[in-house]
Amino acid sequence: MTSSIKLVSGAAILLAALSGQAIAQETIKVGMSGKYFPFTFVKQDKLQGFEVDMWNQIGERTGYKVEFVTASFSGLFGMLETGRVDTISNQITITDERKAKYAFSQPYVYDGAQIVVRKGNSTIHGIKDLEGKTVAVNLGSNFEELLRKNDPNKKIDIRTYDSSFEQDVALGRIDAFVMDRVSTAQLIKESKLPLQQAGAPFETIENSLPFLKTPEKQALLKKVDDALTAMRKDGALRQISEKWFAADITDK
């Protein structure tokens, strides 16, 4: 009888341990800034936006519990490298440098790099007009990289911010900022700040989800990619886009 009790107890302990592992494996940690309207932002103490809705759908389809981890954009890749998050969902652009380090999901947003100036500014129409000007970008963002790539002779005074550079442009403290076309249109509409887009986007960008190149993360990437494919096929991804942008930015 004692042996039977020990056997059952041992099996119960093993089952509990395995169950605990399974529960842990069903959580995916997604890093984002929570400061990039309307992709990821906080309103009335609630994290929301296009990226949040997309991940809630991915969670439902994969069976994973999605845990959002917010931090300044400049710290997100460090969190990915150290395993504090499984991926980053913050309009991450695929670049050659990033492809060498990370595995990427299929693109889920197609957009462009857009210059924004104070309303009434008629001197800036494109990237060449930024020479000699002070231009803001998010620290460590895709747009900082793009702007520096387009300024090989360092004629642009590039200022890096964690957030809220639109206020400085609206007040005339700096000349312009660079962000994605879709977000700038929504920002101008919702904030009522005296801002305007300057010319057409100067570069096309594709946004994707980066994962570490380990077997565990590759398996996770496959499940996320399958969910994105299904969402594209049944129209769920398009519907989320239309909710936030009144347009489909998920297709070329």
Where do the PLM segments sit?
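Ligand-binding clefts/hinges and TM-proximal coupling segments of bilobed small-molecule sensing domains
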Residues: N142-R159, K192, Q197-A198, L228-K252
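Extracytoplasmic small-molecule ligand-binding "clamshell" domains
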Residues: Q25-I92, A100, I158, D234
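Acidic, polar ligand-binding/catalytic clefts
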Residues: E60, K65-D129, L195-E203
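Bilobed "Venus flytrap"/periplasmic-binding protein-like clamshell domains
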Residues: G34-F37, L47-Q57, Q114-Y161, R181-S183
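Extended ligand-binding regions for polar small-molecule ligands
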Residues: V52-R61, N121, K128, L139-N142, ...
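Periplasmic-binding protein-like
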Residues: S33, Y110-V117, A185, K189-D225, ...
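Short helix-initiation/N-cap motifs at beta->coil->alpha
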Residues: E67-G78, S122, D157-L171, V182, ...
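Alpha-to-beta junction loops
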Residues: K29, Y64-K65, E81-N90, K133-T134, ...
